[in-house]
């Protein structure tokens, strides 16, 4: 389990290259070719650092990607039907379309499933038979797999959710998952090299039972307060709540767009100290602008300079920036069809806030903290903790 910034891909690549050096046959699978190639690329770097080269095949996806060009021992195979004949040992990377084929049954020593929190249980069952050992890589506290339709029982869970389901606390209609993998079941990477301790503290206590901490270098990060010019942002690092009351907004708030623009203008050009200790002025590229709804994303894109990094949480998983500005955009009581459960979803809040290396700013209607039901109270508890951090 790799929480944000803990180096899950880095660690997995070192495990894989060690197994390859021991003569094991390895499969790497995920939902997308991009995820598979990303892990393979890190494996190539790890192999080169140890004086070896990555050997094997990458099946499907783009044949001219830099991955194949930078790893001479890695061959590209376009068609899944040709893969088994082309594989002569080492590593093989592909999606479920490859590993679910009958000719791969029992052929590998280990199968690594990356981003396992977004791989469906059905797909995992279909591909797992190709290997004698299965290793899941991911974090069940980040974005869940997209689901269409209704699925009975546990069929709608991802393979990681299924593996980490708390059977004692779960109800038939409400599954509960271990926020941290039990020590007798797997490995938890507990040190982030991304977040300043004041950002990490909220993420750790709210999502990971207090088990996540920052590397000591992360404490160097700070954004200098400009003398006499500070109005909205009064902290050099951490989480800042910027309240904006508005009425009748469901998926878009012009009031919040205006506030986000003011915050961005105030931060632009301020002196930012990195975790390496170097100092430079903040630029547009140093800020992520996140909103739950596409309507608010479009409104922010229209207001911000061209080239601004604007999107929903889904777009930015795996990315980072010195500053993250989250606009929740819904007025009190106006939560739309998805409701408050979508706006304040724990996993989405986790991903949004943990993109920030130094400073996270939450722009929202403060009256959201008025709950009307027990279920809403659980969500509001997280919101209140976020606002008071």
Labelled PLM ranges:
Residues 7:
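Conserved glycine(s) of the Walker
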Residues 35-69, 299, 303-305:
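Conserved helix-turn-beta segment of the N-terminal RecA-like "Helicase ATP-binding" lobe
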Residues 11, 15:
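Hydrophobic positions on the alpha1 helix immediately C-terminal to the Walker A/P-loop
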Residues 1-3, 29:
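Residues at the beta-strand->loop junction immediately N-terminal to the Walker
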Residues 19-26, 48:
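Post-Walker A helix-loop "phosphate-sensing" segment adjacent to the P-loop in P-loop NTPases
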Residues 52-98:
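Inter-Walker segment of RecA-like/P-loop motor cores
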Residues 21-23, 31-37, 42, 97-113, ...:
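Conserved helicase motor core of SF1/SF2 NTP-dependent helicases
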């Amino acid at each position: 389990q790799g929480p944000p910034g803990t180096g899950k891909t880095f660690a997995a690549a070192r495990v894989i290259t060690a197994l390859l050096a021991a003569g094991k046959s390895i499969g790497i699978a995920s939902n997308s070719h991009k995820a598979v190639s990303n892990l393979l690329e890190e494996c190539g770097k790890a192999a080169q650092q140890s004086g070896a080269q990555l050997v094997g095949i990458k099946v499907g996806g783009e044949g001219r990607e830099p991955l194949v060009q930078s790893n001479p021992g890695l061959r590209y195979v376009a068609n899944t039907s040709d893969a088994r004949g082309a594989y002569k040992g080492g590593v093989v990377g592909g999606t479920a379309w490859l590993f679910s084929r009958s000719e791969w049954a029992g052929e590998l020593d280990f199968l690594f499933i990356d981003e396992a929190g977004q791989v469906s249980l059905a797909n995992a069952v279909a591909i797992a038979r190709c290997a004698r050992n299965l290793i899941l890589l991911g974090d069940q506290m980040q974005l869940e797999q997209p689901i269409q339709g209704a699925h009975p029982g546990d069929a709608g869970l991802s393979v990681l959710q299924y593996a980490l389901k708390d059977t004692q606390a779960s109800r038939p209609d409400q599954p509960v998952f271990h926020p941290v993998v039990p020590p007798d079941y797997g490995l938890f990477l507990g040190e982030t090299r991304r977040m300043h301790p004041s950002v990490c503290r909220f993420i750790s206590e709210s999502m990971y039972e207090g088990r996540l901490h920052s590397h000591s270098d992360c404490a160097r990060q700070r954004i200098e307060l400009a003398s006499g010019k500070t109005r909205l942002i009064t902290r050099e690092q951490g989480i800042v709540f910027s309240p904006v009351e508005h009425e009748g907004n469901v998926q878009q708030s012009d009031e919040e767009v205006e506030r986000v623009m003011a915050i961005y203008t105030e931060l632009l050009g301020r002196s930012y100290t990195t975790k390496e200790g170097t100092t430079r002025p903040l630029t547009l590229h140093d800020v992520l602008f996140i909103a739950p709804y596409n309507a608010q994303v479009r409104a922010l894109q229209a207001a911000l300079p061209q080239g601004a990094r604007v999107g929903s949480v889904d777009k930015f998983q795996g990315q980072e920036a010195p500053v993250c500005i989250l606009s929740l955009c819904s007025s009190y009581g106006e939560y739309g069809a998805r409701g408050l459960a979508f706006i304040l979803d724990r996993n989405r809040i986790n991903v949004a806030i943990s993109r920030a290396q130094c400073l996270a700013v939450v722009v929202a209607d403060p009256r959201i903290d008025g709950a009307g039901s027990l279920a809403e109270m659980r969500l509001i508890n997280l919101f209140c903790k976020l606002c008071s951090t």
